[in-house]
């Protein structure tokens, strides 16, 4: 569902930070200044939200996942609820360094968490250990669950990351940019929109503001999931990993079709700037990006020669 301009106004999306804390790169999203506070242009916010929903829809229809990121305590519950409602993954405790750039190690921790949870169930392996050992494993399980419960179903790198506060989540934003993962983020007047594929200018501190925008993104994911074709289940795709150095190898006994599918080369992710230019429909931006890539190819050819 696309929120109206009136709903954005009532939710306080237009309230920015104090003028002395602003980032000059957010100038194009600022409407005015009132009592030492920047007022955000809601017309541009609404336009950016539409672009964000379009990008989210494209990612989900390709069969890729979306990761919600918000480590602010007062907003974590809201973001988690919206992520669970649309079947997306989420990080609401703290960003683990290397969550994306060192995904193989994180995946091992997720597998360990699943093993500990299975062993703690009735009739599980925990019953064969002493009470002290059970207590230690239970503590380890709780510690892992605190940081990894929202990404237990993540078997590969997400296709898109939705961030609540781009400035606070700068480590996650940096990792996503290194891997070419598109980012949709709520950017307050103190953020750097150049690091985001589709920045949504808005209040990233108010509960109603974040809830309204997160709900719009969640609705876009839910609608796209209903239209998307059936994808392999988590168990079927558990062995395939996006960040594998050797690529995806066919499983033992897999059919010819399955082997051909796994041998397909990985598609190269577009850069955030190219995604933003394509969504905005700016022909000049698209031509500039293509020209830049062509220049790099020519330089590479000259150096080889």
Model-predicted segments: where are they?
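Ribosome large-subunit tunnel/peptidyl-transferase-proximal elements
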Residues: 1-229
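Generic intrinsically disordered, low-complexity segments enriched for polar/acidic and small residues
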Residues: 26-28, 239, 265
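Internal, active-site/partner-interface "lid" segment
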Residues: 126-129, 133-138, 223-259
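Arginine-glycine-rich low-complexity intrinsically disordered regions
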Residues: 242-285
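Intrinsically disordered, low-complexity regulatory segments in nuclear proteins
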Residues: 274-305
């Amino acid at each position: 569902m696309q929120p109206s301009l009136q709903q954005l106004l009532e939710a306080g999306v237009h309230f920015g930070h104090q003028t002395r804390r602003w980032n000059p790169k957010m100038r194009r999203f600022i409407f005015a200044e009132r009592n030492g506070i920047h007022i955000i242009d809601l017309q541009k916010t609404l336009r950016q939200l539409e672009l964000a929903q379009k990008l989210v829809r494209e990612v989900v229809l390709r069969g890729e996942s979306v990761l919600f990121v918000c480590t602010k305590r007062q907003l974590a519950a809201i973001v988690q609820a919206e992520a669970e409602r649309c079947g997306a993954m989420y990080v609401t405790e703290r960003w683990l360094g290397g969550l994306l750039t060192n995904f193989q190690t994180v995946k091992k921790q997720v597998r360990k968490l699943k093993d500990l949870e299975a062993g703690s169930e009735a009739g599980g392996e925990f019953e064969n250990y002493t009470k002290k050992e059970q207590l230690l494993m239970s503590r380890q399980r709780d510690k892992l669950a605190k940081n990894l419960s929202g990404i237990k179903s993540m078997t590969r790198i997400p296709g898109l990351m939705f961030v609540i506060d781009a400035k606070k989540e700068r480590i996650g934003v940096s990792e996503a940019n290194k891997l070419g993962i598109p980012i949709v983020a709520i950017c307050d007047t103190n953020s750097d929109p150049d690091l985001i594929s589709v920045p949504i200018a808005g209040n990233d501190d108010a509960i109603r503001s974040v809830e309204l925008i997160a709900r719009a993104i969640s609705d876009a994911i839910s609608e796209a999931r209903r239209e998307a074709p059936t994808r392999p289940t988590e168990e079927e795709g558990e062995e395939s990993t996006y960040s594998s150095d050797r690529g995806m190898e066919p499983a033992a006994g897999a059919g010819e079709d399955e082997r051909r599918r796994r041998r397909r080369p990985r598609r190269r992710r577009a850069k955030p700037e190219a995604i933003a230019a394509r969504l905005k429909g700016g022909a000049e931006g698209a031509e500039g990006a293509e020209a830049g890539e062509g220049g790099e190819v020519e330089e590479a050819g000259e150096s080889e020669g």
